[in-house]
């Protein structure tokens, strides 16, 4: 039985994880921590794995504490940069048996969409990403959209494709979206949305649209629990859930950081 601590336990995703752990005979909830609570409860209650769905300002301190105490971490908190990843890698060098999984999205449908986008990318001249989220999301574009665009860019580069055709010379600021390695990414923030993504491909005479929708935050729970079950066998930093689903094949060159 895996002993689990949840950080951000009173948040929308965190509360769904708490409910899932409590309902599963193979996992034991030993700490449910939220803003203002003491992380020492993780050590005192012998947590083996932490699930972190907090905020960008808190996640680095949480991870430093967990790594220093040999507690594996499954992280869905947003706001990641390469500098932050490098910091985590440095901490993990001092705790080589500890594993940290950071995933831009834990919905299995979203992970598959990212994979399908990489597969499709070499066959189309043009590709753009549109992500749609609730208005309380603090980062734009989403980590999922950035991860999707980066995968598309890698696949296009590997296939030797030229830059995407775009004759735009006059536009309002932001009209063509954010440029992620040559792939335009557009962010929508709208009441009534939860987490959604569209990837649109085009070439002569045809288009392909991949569409993914998460209507409820419970959609993230199955992927989170896969991460919880497998992180102990994967020391170091892993970015993306693909590896744990067996999807880190030749197309994306592997998800191991």
Curated annotation (Swiss-Prot):
NAD(+) binds at residues 8-13, 76-78, 103-106. One of its GO terms (molecular function) is 4-hydroxy-tetrahydrodipicolinate reductase. Pathway: Amino-acid biosynthesis; L-lysine biosynthesis via DAP pathway; (S)-tetrahydrodipicolinate from L-aspartate: step 4/4. InterPro entries: DapB_C, DapB_N, DapB_N_CS, DHDPR_bac, NAD(P)-bd_dom_sf. It is found in: Cytoplasm. Coiled coil: none annotated. It catalyses: (S)-2,3,4,5-tetrahydrodipicolinate + NAD(+) + H2O = (2S,4S)-4-hydroxy-2,3,4,5-tetrahydrodipicolinate + NADH + H(+); (S)-2,3,4,5-tetrahydrodipicolinate + NADP(+) + H2O = (2S,4S)-4-hydroxy-2,3,4,5-tetrahydrodipicolinate + NADPH + H(+). Keywords: Amino-acid biosynthesis, Cytoplasm, Diaminopimelate biosynthesis, Lysine biosynthesis, NAD, NADP, Oxidoreductase. (S)-2,3,4,5-tetrahydrodipicolinate binds at residues 134, 143-144. It holds the Pfam family DapB_N. The active site is at 133 (proton donor/acceptor), 137 (proton donor). GO terms for cellular component: cytosol. Catalyzes the conversion of 4-hydroxy-tetrahydrodipicolinate (HTPA) to tetrahydrodipicolinate. This is 4-hydroxy-tetrahydrodipicolinate reductase. The lineage of its organism: Bacteria, Bacillati, Actinomycetota, Actinomycetes, Mycobacteriales.
């Amino acid at each position: 039985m895996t002993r689990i601590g949840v950080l951000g336990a009173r948040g929308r995703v965190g509360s769904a994880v708490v409910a899932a752990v409590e309902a599963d005979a193979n996992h034991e909830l030993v700490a449910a921590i939220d803003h203002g609570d003491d992380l020492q409860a993780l050590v005192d209650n012998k947590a083996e794995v932490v699930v972190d769905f907090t905020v960008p300002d808190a996640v680095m301190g949480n991870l430093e504490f967990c790594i220093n105490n040999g507690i594996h971490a499954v992280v869905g908190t947003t706001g990641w940069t390469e500098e932050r990843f490098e910091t985590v890698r440095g901490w993990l060098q001092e705790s080589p048996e500890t594993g940290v999984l950071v995933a831009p999205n834990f919905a299995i449908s979203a992970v598959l969409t990212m994979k399908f986008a990489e597969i499709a990318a070499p066959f189309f001249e043009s590709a753009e990403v549109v992500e749609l989220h609730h208005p309380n999301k603090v980062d734009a574009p989403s980590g999922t959209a950035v991860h999707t665009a980066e995968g598309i860019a890698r696949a296009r580069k590997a296939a030797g494709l030229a830059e995407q055709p775009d004759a735009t010379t006059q536009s309002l600021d932001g009209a063509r979206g954010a440029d992620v390695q040559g792939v335009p990414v557009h962010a929508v923030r709208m009441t009534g949305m939860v987490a959604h993504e569209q990837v649109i491909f085009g070439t002569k005479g045809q288009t392909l649209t991949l569409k993914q929708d998460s209507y409820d935050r419970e959609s993230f729970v199955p992927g989170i629990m896969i991460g919880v079950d497998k992180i102990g066998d994967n020391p170091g930093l892993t970015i993306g859930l693909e590896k744990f689903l067996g999807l880190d094949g030749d197309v994306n060159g592997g998800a191991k950081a």
